[in-house]
UniProtKB/Swiss-Prot annotation:
HAMAP family, per database record: UPF0235
Pfam families: DUF167 (PF02594)
NCBIfam families: DUF167 family protein
Organism: Endomicrobium trichonymphae
Protein name (Swiss-Prot/TrEMBL): UPF0235 protein TGRD_618
InterPro entries for the chain: DUF167 (IPR003746), YggU-like_sf (IPR036591)
SUPFAM superfamilies named among the record's database cross-references: YggU-like (SSF69786)
GO cellular component, one term: cytoplasm
Amino acid sequence: MIIKVRVIPNSKRNEVVSRVGSILRVKITAPAIEGRANEELCDFLSDFFDVKRSMIFLRKGERGREKTIEVLGRLEEELNEVLDTIP
């Protein structure tokens, strides 16, 4: 499943803030320096979607705040159920 994510780095804690249409807004504690926020985002999303870290792929947006993430390892219906819990 492909997910669009807008990252907010340097936050107090890692959390999914909201979902605006098909875009997730995610706060990450790591700074946007040398890919640290990207790594922490992938780690956080693997926990959030309950998949292995190796099943999360950053497909686009390595240097920007808007990212395209691919999540594998679970059925799309299961991932949609997780997404539906977000306000």
